[in-house]
Regions:
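Core, highly hydrophobic multi-pass alpha-helical transmembrane subunits of bioenergetic inner membranes
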Residues: 1-290
Length: 290
């Protein structure tokens, strides 16, 4: 356990350091190198958990990192293969149709891995727009983003068996939002969006890690849950949703409608959970349990 903590601290330092280096890289090759080093820096986080499922999670993460890396470098080397770069980045961010690996990695790992995948590793989206030449590449990103929102909107009700499942849905939805916005918005505005997301996501992951495994949350945790996740006047969630919603609306109306559907589905699910706290889980419906 002590060795795992030391490895995780080392991985955290490398993860933050290489992510910062993305912003000072002066060519595409160095950008790709720092991006992959940041991804590999997450591997020590897996060793905090000794459960057998961690090996499946780690294997899936390494395979996806390798495949996406190959696609990205192929797109960077050959202009005619730019679509492969876009596909590689979509795979790395877990957008439709590449959402499955995100669930395998997050569900069978620990909350430190969940935090790393959900926050720091998302910083590379700020450079997504620089690789797009417009036309079909931008359309592909918007289509995949819109379909991601629609599928996640249903997944909240069909595939949520705990808080880590819920956050996997929410994180993929946020990834789709960030990637879609990177196509149209200015780098300055994207940086503000990411800083807001980084703070909000870190707070949510910290809270959900405390709630995980608790059948009936404490009253204080419920208030924090409402403040961070339920969109009502004065909550942090409503500011985040409005900010992101306005940004997505300025990008594409169709994608915005998909995001609205996903957000409404998420809010109704959370409200149903809060109303059902203390009610026997068999009364919630089939397949929905915490």
């Amino acid at each position: 356990m002590f060795r795992g903590v030391l490895l995780s601290i080392f991985g955290l330092v490398c993860l933050v350091g290489f992510s910062i280096c993305l912003f000072v890289s002066d060519n595409l090759l160095m950008f790709w190198l720092f991006l992959e080093l940041a991804s590999l820096s997450l591997i020590p986080f897996f060793f905090l958990d000794s459960e057998s499922g961690v090996l499946v999670s780690l294997f899936s993460y390494v395979v996806v990192s390798g495949v996406s890396s190959s696609l990205v470098v192929s797109g960077l080397m050959f202009d005619d293969l730019l679509t492969l770069l876009v596909i590689g980045l979509l795979l790395k961010f877990g957008l439709f149709p590449f959402m499955g690996w995100v669930y395998v990695v997050l569900i069978y790992s620990n909350w430190l891995v969940v935090w790393g995948v959900s926050t720091i590793l998302k910083s590379s989206f700020l450079f997504f727009g620089f690789f797009l030449s417009g036309g079909w590449d931008s359309v592909l990103v918007e289509v995949c983003g819109g379909l991601t929102f629609i599928f996640i909107g249903f997944f909240f009700w069909l595939y949520t068996y705990g808080w880590v499942y819920y956050w996997s849905h929410a994180m993929i939805s946020s990834s789709a939002s960030l990637v879609v916005m990177s196509v149209e918005l200015s780098p300055d505005l994207l940086l503000y969006v990411f800083m807001f997301y980084l703070f909000w996501a870190s707070m949510v992951v910290m809270l959900l890690s405390r709630l995980d495994g608790s059948r009936v949350p404490r009253l204080g945790y419920i208030f924090l849950l409402i403040f961070l996740l339920i969109s009502f006047p004065g909550s942090l969630s409503i500011f985040y949703k409005l900010f992101v919603g306005l940004c997505i609306y300025s990008c594409s109306l169709i994608v915005f409608l998909g995001w609205v559907f996903c957000s409404i589905s998420e809010q109704f699910y959370l409200i149903k959970y809060l109303v059902g706290v203390g009610v026997p889980r068999t009364e919630w419906g089939v397949g929905i349990t915490f």
